[in-house]
Every structure is written in structure tokens, then in C-alpha cells.
Amino acid sequence: MTARFRTVFVTSKPVIGMVHLGALPGTPLYDPSVDLIAAARADLHALQAAGFDAVMFGNENDRPYEFQVDAASSAMMAYVIGQLRAEITVPFGVNMLWDPMASVAVGAATGAGFIREIFTGTYASDMGVWSPDAGKAMRYRDRLGRSDMAMLFNVSAEFAHSLDQRSLPDRARSAVFSSIPDAVLVSGQITGEAAAMSDLEAVKAVLPDTPVMANTGVKHDTVADVLRVADGCIVGSSLKFDGDTWKPVDPDRAQDFMDRVRATRA
């Protein structure tokens, strides 16, 4: 476990709640009549009131996704976080799908404690063939003076299939050796779908000293089992009204989720 991870996440097996911003400027679904700040504020306060260990701001609504995020989208993400900064009482992170460099830039600019992205591997995806550069992203982080910002590596990308012939555990183990992530994330096939427990178990078995987190599809009735294996989780869709990714956070669902987490920890 890296010093950065321990510094950002003081709780054992942290649970990170997602603040999915509405579609941002420069994307097809952007609606200028939507108050992005008010919507993000409501989700943020619901998650903090429920007791989430951390929150992460993401641009899940910026469909169709791109490998290089529009500058206007990054600027708006940074602006929204800046407007809410004084109200954030827990560690927070940023993810600009599917752009590692934009994630680094926005995370650095807003004072985020961590970022999430795909940083390693080669994938065939809905967006095309995809080969991120972990070395470039990490060096960029350091040039921006944010070597303290933790980088969480998703090693099983949603909406994509790895072109690497190695097994997921081998790819995860190799990524840790070659690219020094602060944590490894294991995902399902798309947003809101769970990673197979067998995948979580296999990756954790080969990375006993590296945090391995469940990245997608953790639900109220599975979180206890997930946290018996994983070193934490990131959750979004399960917390929304009707469990719908595109709806706001339901304070009652968020509270119930963390009540179950606390029962597991006890």
C-alpha cells in the first residue's frame, strides 16, 4: 500500500461515492438550462450525510465518450468543483472519462486527493482502439506539482475488451510492477455492472500488498461480500433513485448503503 493511498484514505476499505455531473459543455447531451452546480451539490451533500469515506466527481453523462475530453468540459468540471470546494468535507477525486491527461489536469487544478482512469494496456472499445500512457500521465502529474495525488488504475476497462492475451491477474500484476499505481480497480463490462467476484479474488490473490478495489456494480446486497475480498469500492448507480445511473443520488439509498457498510465493518 502506497503512502499516497494511506494519506488520502484514512479508513480501512474506503467506500467512494460518485457525483456524476450532468452533461458538460462541448458534449451532445449538454443542456444549458440544467444547473450543474445545484445538482452536484445535492448529490455531494447526500453522500456526505450518509457517511461515505470519499467522493469522486465524474463526467459519466458526457456520451458518446472520447479519448480526449473537450477543453470546455474540463473547464466546467473544474469550475463546478471549485464552486463546491468549501462544502466538501471528505477526500475527493476526479475522473474525466476516458482521458488520463484531463483527469490529471482537473484533479491537480481542483486540489483532488486522487484520480481514476485507464492508464495501462491496449483495448478495443466502443470509442475505438485505446492505448493510454501511464508514464506520460504520471510525469504530467508531477510536473503540475501534485506528486501527492493518488492515481487509481482501472485495469479492466468498461465498454472495452483488452487486446492483451495475458490474464487479468497477470495484467494487474504487471501494471503494478511497471507503472506503480496507488491502487488497482476491477470493473464490470459497463457502468453499473459488477465485476465478477472471481476476478476480484484472482487479482487480490496476486496483489496482496496493493489496494484492489471494486470499481463498478457494487450493490446494497453485495457490498458485504465485496468488502470481504476487495480493499474498498467505488459506487454510483446503486445510490441513485431507482438504481438508475442517470438519476440523482437518493439520500435514503445512500444512507442504507453505508449502514450496511458500517455493519460489515463492525
Segments predicted by a language model, with ranges:
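Alpha-helix-loop-beta-strand connector modules within alpha/beta enzyme cores
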Residues: 11-12, 17-18, 66-94, 132-153, ...
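Short beta-strand segments at enzyme active-site cores
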Residues: 15-18, 51-64, 91-96, 117, ...
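Conserved, mostly hydrophobic/aromatic
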Residues: 17, 47, 55, 115, ...
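Active-site mouth loops of central-metabolism enzymes
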Residues: 20-41, 92-99, 153-169, 214-219
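Conserved anion-binding
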Residues: 21-24, 102, 106-183
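Catalytic cores of alpha/beta
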Residues: 33-34, 94, 99-112, 170-171, ...
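Glycine-rich, proline-tolerant flexible connector loops at the mouths of alpha/beta enzymes
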Residues: 51-76, 122-127, 181-194, 242-244
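Short loop-to-alpha-helix "cap/lid" segments that border enzyme active sites
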Residues: 165-184, 191-209, 221
